[in-house]
Amino acid sequence: MARIAGVNIPTAKRVVIALTYIHGIGTKFAQEIVEKVGIPAERRVHQLTDAEVLQIRETIDRDYQVEGDLRRETSMNIKRLMDLGCYRGLRHRRGLPVRGQRTHTNARTRKGPAKAIAGKKK
């Protein structure tokens, strides 16, 4: 198993698909990386040489923000919004939808499981 950016990449899959297992790399970035390194798109991970794996690793480290760094930046952006006290920050703090979705019904993913209210018997 090749290890790139702290993630074990599945060996049986094509390189483009396997790279998407890294947080922050989707299909578009994976295709860009493969083109930059010059690896055929049909190549499987177990067919890669050590030099090619090293090239992929260096390209990702140099050009992309992935895994821990990306997660840290995202959480810092959310924390900044919460510290500012802006509307989006308040929504994050209260655990409600941030992007204008309705909350009268739905929004259960963001709000958590429904809480029973006492005194609602017939």
UniProtKB/Swiss-Prot annotation:
Gene that produces this protein: rpsM
Function: Located at the top of the head of the 30S subunit, it contacts several helices of the 16S rRNA. In the 70S ribosome it contacts the 23S rRNA (bridge B1a) and protein L5 of the 50S subunit (bridge B1b), connecting the 2 subunits; these bridges are implicated in subunit movement. Contacts the tRNAs in the A and P-sites.
Chain spans, region Disordered: 99-122
Annotated transmembrane regions: none
Oligomeric and partner information: Part of the 30S ribosomal subunit. Forms a loose heterodimer with protein S19. Forms two bridges to the 50S subunit in the 70S ribosome.
Gene3D superfamilies the record matches: 1.10.8.50, 30s ribosomal protein s13, domain 2
HAMAP family: Ribosomal_uS13 (MF_01315)
A Pfam family the protein falls into: Ribosomal_S13
Annotated source species: Sinorhizobium medicae (strain WSM419)
Matching InterPro entries: Rbsml_uS13_C (IPR027437), Ribosomal_uS13 (IPR001892), Ribosomal_uS13-like_H2TH (IPR010979), Ribosomal_uS13_bac-type (IPR019980), Ribosomal_uS13_CS (IPR018269)
GO MF, any single term: structural constituent of ribosome
GO cellular component: cytosol; small ribosomal subunit
Ribosomal protein listed as a keyword: yes
Keywords: Ribonucleoprotein, Ribosomal protein, RNA-binding, rRNA-binding, tRNA-binding
GO terms of biological process kind: translation
Family: Belongs to the universal ribosomal protein uS13 family.
PANTHER family reported in the protein's UniProt record: 30S RIBOSOMAL PROTEIN S13/40S RIBOSOMAL PROTEIN S18, SMALL RIBOSOMAL SUBUNIT PROTEIN US13M
Highest taxon in the source lineage: Bacteria
Protein name from the UniProt record: Small ribosomal subunit protein uS13
